[in-house]
């Protein structure tokens, strides 16, 4: 399952590691070091999935604020949150705000890949379900 993924993290090494891991699996990736750049990239071309770090230095908003912005504009965009300083409360807050899931750094590559695959699959199924519901009244009308 190939997708276009935006990676937002203030640490270049983390962005590169995630990007290489995903590219090795056939995904196309784009990287942003802060919320401002992420918003610009999202506005230009919404991806299939976004991976957002919660704590970003030198950014005009943190990952939870960016998540709120993303969900306000792209409510169906799957978002996976990552953090090296996360707590259970932070993870719960992110999921309540619409994140698909939360991964704590450091993480294993296979865990990241599984989360990305599951988030993209859930998004695809939600989209297909909405399309079927939209067609259902047409198909059930008597001739």
Predicted features along the sequence, with ranges:
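Short hydrophobic/Thr-rich beta-strand motif most characteristic of the beta2 strand and flanking loop
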Residues: 26-36, 41, 60
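C-terminal output helix
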Residues: 87-89, 103, 107-117
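Flexible nucleotide-interacting loop at or near the entrance of a catalytic core
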Residues: 111-143
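Short amphipathic alpha-helix used as the core "switch/output" element in two-component signaling
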Residues: 39-40, 62-76, 93
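Active-site beta3 strand of CheY-like receiver
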Residues: 45-51, 56
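Charged docking surfaces used in two-component/phosphorelay signaling
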Residues: 16-24
């Amino acid at each position: 399952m190939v997708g276009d993924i935006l990676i937002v993290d203030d640490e270049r090494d983390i962005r590169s590691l995630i990007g290489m891991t995903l590219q090795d699996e056939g995904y196309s990736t784009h990287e942003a070091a802060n919320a401002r750049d992420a918003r610009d990239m999202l506005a230009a071309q919404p991806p299939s999935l976004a991976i957002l770090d919660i704590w970003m230095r030198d950014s005009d908003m943190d990952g939870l604020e960016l998540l709120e912005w993303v969900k306000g504009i792209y409510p169906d965009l799957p978002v996976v949150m990552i953090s090296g300083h996360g707590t259970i409360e932070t993870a719960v807050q992110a999921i309540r705000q619409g994140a698909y899931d939360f991964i704590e750094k450091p993480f294993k590559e296979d865990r990241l890949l599984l989360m990305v695959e599951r988030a993209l699959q859930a998004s695809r199924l939600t989209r297909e379900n909405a399309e079927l519901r939209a067609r259902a009244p047409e198909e059930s009308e008597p001739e």
